[in-house]
């Protein structure tokens, strides 16, 4: 982690997001109704989904902190992928309703220009949500938390949608009343796309997709550079919530005693944990190299 307090931020960030989302939901909803902006009202529903998403994220972080037990011997880390999928689903469902309502409004021709105050309100929410995105994406990346990263993108989608609302309202005020409704359609398409991306990433995590090739190459290099390691004949890695797990099978000098072989394996494990961020569970299987092989010391 970059800073010592990154772990503390992990415990605080979602509460800040939860509070900000509640304020933004009420602010945009009330201002949208008062100003007559259908896009801003729709955007407030998006923020309402953010409130639920922040609550789900907070719950998943609490559960993922639980230690491994007999029922879940690999820990509770994958609950964060479920949280990410729920957030993505909420965005997708909300976008679908918003798209439907906006298209019906566009076809029927029942639209009128909202007040310019809607644009001012949207500009405030753009700033707040972008700040929350930057805060959460920093904390999420430093803690390798898919749940916090998903929540960050939820706020980024809210910032972008509010920006679209602002443009639509301004265009409506200067003589294009249809622009507010078109902005709502654009917002719904964007939010739906982000929702699908979050769901896709969650599915990859739950299906134990491999870590990046670069990370595997780093682990491979660390292991082969460790003294008395002859070769690596199997290596795989996966994400489990915030942690990275590796399964490594290596060969050592056949003349080594069992105790010494274990010490070599422990050296590999320690180096990987020290040099690869979030590497928590390193599973090693050691076997002797062919007797004729000369091993580097």
From Swiss-Prot:
Induction: Part of the probable 17 gene mamAB operon. Changing residue 247 to A: About 30% fewer magnetite particles per cell, their size is normal. GO terms for molecular function: metal ion binding; monoatomic cation transmembrane transporter activity. Residues 1-214 are annotated as: Transmembrane domain (TMD). InterPro entries: Cation_efflux (IPR002524), Cation_efflux_CTD (IPR027470), Cation_efflux_CTD_sf (IPR036837), Cation_efflux_TMD_sf (IPR027469), CDF_Transporter (IPR050291), Magnetosome_CDF_Transporter (IPR053436). GO terms for biological process: iron ion transport. Pfam families: Cation_efflux (PF01545), ZT_dimer (PF16916). The C-terminal domain (CTD) is probably responsible for hetero- and homodimerization and binds 1 Fe cation per subunit. The CTD assumes a V-shaped, dimeric metallo-chaperone-like fold. This bacteria makes up to 60 cubo-octahedral magnetosomes of about 45 nm in diameter which contain membrane-bound crystals of magnetite (Fe(3)O(4)). This is Magnetosome protein MamB. The gene is mamB.
